[in-house]
Amino acid sequence: MDIKFLYDNHETLKEQKVTIIGRVRSNRQGKAVSFMVLNDGTVLNDLQVVYKPETFGFEQGSKARVSSIVEIEGILIPTPTRPQPFEINATSITLLDQAIEEYPLQKKEHSPEFLREISHLRARTKTFQAIFRIRSTAAFAIHKFFQENNYVYVTTPIITSNDAEGAGEQFVVTVNEDKDYANDFFGKKASLTVSGQLNGEAFAQAFKNIYTFGPTFRAENSHTTKHASEFWMIEPEVAFADINDNIQLMQDMLKSVVGYVLEKNMTELEFLQEQLEPGLIDKITGIVNVEFKVNTYEEVLKTLQDAIDKGHKFEENNIHFGLDLGTEHERFICEEVNKCPTFVINYPKDIKSFYMKQNDDGKTVAAVDLLVPGIGELCGGSEREANLDKILERCEFYGINPEELDWYIGLRKYGFYKSAGFGLGFERLIMYITGASNIRDVIPFPRTPKTLLY
């Protein structure tokens, strides 16, 4: 029997004997009555236990420190006038394991910075229990959405020889201290993947609808609240699809996942709304209930310039074609102008990746970013370039050796008519849903520069 079972069935269990094992959150002694608060991790809500000097095992129970493990036998008593719907009047207490006095999570407020230093313990706090339970629900919801829509789940390689993003920020995998890659394990330079997209495109040509969901790695020496060296990516790919199909898929998937979390984790969301972000539930409910807007990149530039002309100040006021939009620009568009999630399409080709389809205007590509209030860019994707000559020309522009991607580029030789997909950073989505302000707080054991504690 666990605490979630008691909450789910407390009306039918009233006045009945129950047995529960849990971890002590607090233990307060009084002259006539003592109170112990337990949690076993199965539900965010705690369980209050009432015990008295005549309770069997009272001495053990009264000595139980915070984080100790106890077994409680007792009677479930309804408490409709109190914050919790019921409590347990203990008839027996057994101290199964006593925690040391120096347990770091005592009953007081702890800073996020301190809790990041004890990632192996912080999941025991209510805030992190709420965040990681929502993370679990959202991960399931992603698989649920794609499986119910006839997508094939593809596990793409973690060790790879390609840099899908062309940024060169990869972790090298080697067993050779001399970095002689020709004599290394794979006979060539190998790295941890930055994206499963290229491999996913190959499988989309076989199955039409595929998605990947797995870890990716970036050797980016960044210390911002949005960047981590290891994170998870969702990357669907659809053959015969264009940018409009891609936009619809982004919207459908996001609405489905957020809607599922709202259905399954309202208790956690209410707690996080109180602790982390007032208005959180209304914010994410807006994702489900509103229709997203679409603006072209050049429309966005005009809107930004108009705002500057009327006196608005950005940190970057030099608005020009080729500008890589900053978070301040993205948030202004979706928060102040459109007041809803916004797709921005048709970016300059020279600020986007080599594999994106070139538009007929010769200067833009069929790329799309989704901007959401409170965060800016949430995910991005594109229609893929199907023309062999054009993709070779883009490889040359970016200094990419086409021989290293011969298998990928060669897909265009064997029947290739459109393909589109996008990448969504899972942790960025969880930050948005939970109101967490730092990516380190939505990953169980975060990996960031100079930090590898576990």
Swiss-Prot record:
InterPro entries: Aa-tRNA-synt_II, aa-tRNA-synth_II, aa-tRNA-synth_II/BPL/LPL, Asn-tRNA-ligase, Asp/Asn-tRNA-synth_IIb, NA-bd_OB-fold, NA-bd_OB_tRNA. It holds the Pfam family tRNA_anti-codon. Its main location: cytoplasm. GO terms for molecular function: asparagine-tRNA ligase activity; ATP binding; nucleic acid binding. GO terms for biological process: asparaginyl-tRNA aminoacylation. Its EC number is 6.1.1.22. Gene3D superfamilies: Bira Bifunctional Protein, Domain 2 (3.30.930.10), Nucleic acid-binding proteins (2.40.50.140). It is found in: Cytoplasm. It catalyses: tRNA(Asn) + L-asparagine + ATP = L-asparaginyl-tRNA(Asn) + AMP + diphosphate + H(+). Keywords: Aminoacyl-tRNA synthetase, ATP-binding, Cytoplasm, Ligase, Nucleotide-binding, Protein biosynthesis. GO terms for cellular component: cytoplasm. It comes from the Bacteria. Belongs to the class-II aminoacyl-tRNA synthetase family. Homodimer. This is Asparagine--tRNA ligase. It comes from Mesoplasma florum (strain ATCC 33453 / NBRC 100688 / NCTC 11704 / L1) (Acholeplasma florum).
